[in-house]
């Protein structure tokens, strides 16, 4: 129990789930949190399944341990979406899953068992609706687009670089408080919409205006030539 809360020592308001999620933006901290939560869940499972261990705690303590498990399981589900981590329930042993089913309804936790595809409008948008704040939704869009850019960048560098630049510009504006959380989210929805449609501000020759494969080839060649001859 104490080890789990120790992960969040720097946080002032430990009841603020948004502050906790922002703190978990660091991948190393997030990984530590996931591992510590799994250990805590297993320990709680042992207590609930042992008459002697159960008897060693007051009822209020058991309820506190249970509520902590529920609270951080919700956080875990949310940040895995927010930061585009691989969603995998394999670390939850059958006993752990049964325990969660006992104390948490389906509505309590975002249930996701398949990888999230941001190109599927209905699926991803439903997931976003479950996130608690405008910033968490915007962060999720940024993380998932960035992940896709990283995986596919070599296929069309110019195309993906254009979206990286738009995302970085929006992040900088948000960081400098030029954009509010709502404005940041609105801008990210615009980026997501263009990303899905393949719309960029990049100009192509008229003959390949409707040919995405030709545009990808053109983008690769153009980026090489622009870099070689230092063309702006």
Roles of regions detected by a PLM:
Residues 1-232:
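Catalytic cores and motor modules of nucleic-acid processing enzymes
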